[in-house]
Amino acid sequence: MLNQKIQNPNPDELMIEVDLCYELDPYELKLDEMIEAEPEPEMIEGLPASDALTPADRYLELFEHVQSEKIFPDSKTFPDCAPKMDPLDILIRYRKVRRHRDFDLRKFVENHFWLPEVYSSEYVSDPQNSLKEHIDQLWPVLTREPQDHIPWSSLLALPQSYIVPGGRFSETYYWDSYFTMLGLAESGREDLLKCMADNFAWMIENYGHIPNGNRTYYLSRSQPPVFALMVELFEEDGVRGARRYLDHLKMEYAFWMDGAESLIPNQAYRHVVRMPDGSLLNRYWDDRDTPRDESWLEDVETAKHSGRPPNEVYRDLRAGAASGWDYSSRWLRDTGRLASIRTTQFIPIDLNAFLFKLESAIANISALKGEKETEALFRQKASARRDAVNRYLWDDENGIYRDYDWRREQLALFSAAAIVPLYVGMANHEQADRLANAVRSRLLTPGGILASEYETGEQWDKPNGWAPLQWMAIQGFKMYGDDLLGDEIARNWLKTVNQFYLEQHKLIEKYHIADGVPREGGGGEYPLQDGFGWTNGVVRRLIGLYGEP
C-alpha cells in the first residue's frame, strides 16, 4: 500500500518532548521579555453588552455544575440550550435550591431550558438515489431559515437562510461554508449562495470579523479566512459582483492584522507575529483564555494533564479550534498528547496562504475600481508575505512547506496544509513540483490524501481524510499543471465517498482512508457526524467535473 511508505517520518520534523513532566523548556524561559510585551486583548469585538455573553458568562457556577456532571453526553448541548426565562432569575433559583437534599440537576435544567432541536433526525435517505441525487436532496434538510433572536440564546440570528454542516452542528461555520458553497453552485442553488454571501458580509459589518460560527461562544475567534475565496466564487458564478465586497475584505484584513504596526521583532499580538527580520506573519488566536463553552469538561481535563498554567492551555485549545484543525499533531509539542498543545506559537502555512489570497484579492478588486494606491499597497503586502513564507516556512531540503515554531525558531511538522499555497497561487512551479513528489510518497493513499502522516488519535491526522483538503489538493496541483496527480486524488476520493455511500447511504464528516477500505473516520472530541456540509459540497463539485463514480 502507498501508505506504507510513510511509517517512518523524517525525524527532523518530530517535536516530541523528552521529559513529559517538564513543560517550560529553555526555549520558552529565555523569552520573558517577548511574553511580557504581548498585551492582553481588550473585550471581544462584536456584539456589545449582554448579547455577547456566552452561556458560561451567564450561568457561572450553574454552567460549570451542568458540564462537570455530564448531564448531557455532548458538552455542546447545554451551551446550545435556550433559557425559558431571564438567565439571572434562573441563576438565583439555582442558588436557592442547589443544596436541597432532593435537588435534581437534570430536572432543574429541563424545567428552565429548551433543549436544542435536532433538525435532521427525521430524514431518511432513499437508498435508490445516486450520490448526486442524495446530495441535491440534502440541501433543504441542511438549510436553516432566518429567525428572530431567541432572548439570551447563544445562537446569533442571521438575516438570510444558511446551510449547517449537520449532526451536532446546528449553526453555520465560517470555513466549512466555502466548501459547502462549491456544491451549492454546482447544484444550481444560486438562491442559497446569495443568502450566505449576504450573511457573511453582514457578520463582518456587525462583528468586525466572521466568527467561527453564529454562536456567542464563537465570537472571540474566527476560522481560516476564506472570505476572499467566497467572493471569487460569487463572481465566477455570477451571484454577486466582487466589487461590492472590497470594504468587507479590508475589514477582515484589519481584524487579522490588528496591532501589527506597534510590534517590534520577536513580538506577537493577537493574530500577528513580527519575525526577527521585521516581516509579518500570522498565527491562530482566540481572545479568551477560558475553557470553551462547547467543550468545557474536555478542556478542563486536558489542562489538568498539561503541567502549564490552565489559561495558557485554554488559549491554545481555542486557537486550535480557530484553525479548523481541531485537533492535529500540527499543534502538539508531543505528537501523542493533546495536553502539550502550543497552537499560538506556530506560524501555520495554510493561514498565511489564505491571507496572501486576501491581500491579493484586495489588490485585484482595488485595481478594478481604479484605486491604484490601495492596489499597490496590497500587492506589496502579498509579495512581502510570500517572501516571508519562503524564508521561514519553506523546507528546501525536503521540498515541502511546513508550519514554523516562531518561539523555538524551527520548522514543525509536514501535513496536507502544505497544499494551500498551491490552491491560492502563492508557490512557484519548482515548489509545486517538489511538493507533488512529497505528497505522492507521504500522503497519497488509494482513498485520497491523508491529513498528516502521524497517528495520534486526533481527528486531523492519519488515518483520516477530509473533503476540503482533497479539493484544495486537486485544484492546487492542476493549477500548476500536474493533472495526473490532481485527477488521481479526485478519483480516489470519489471512490471512497461513493463506496461508503453505497454501503451506508450517507456522507460523513471525515473518512478513514489509510488502507484503501473506506470506513468511518475516528478520533477527536465528539462522535463522527453525518450530513455533511463540506463533504457534500466538495463531492457535488467533483461529480460535476468528473461525473459520478
Swiss-Prot record:
One of its GO terms (biological process) is cellular hyperosmotic response. Pathway: Glycan degradation; trehalose degradation; D-glucose from alpha,alpha-trehalose: step 1/1. Coiled coil: none annotated. The active site is at residues 326, 509. It is an enzyme of class 3 (hydrolase). GO terms for molecular function: alpha,alpha-trehalase activity. One of its GO terms (cellular component) is cytoplasm. Substrate binds at residues 168, 175-176, 212, 221-223, 292-294, 324, 525. Hydrolyzes trehalose to glucose. Could be involved, in cells returning to low osmolarity conditions, in the utilization of the accumulated cytoplasmic trehalose, which was synthesized in response to high osmolarity. Belongs to the glycosyl hydrolase 37 family. This is Cytoplasmic trehalase.
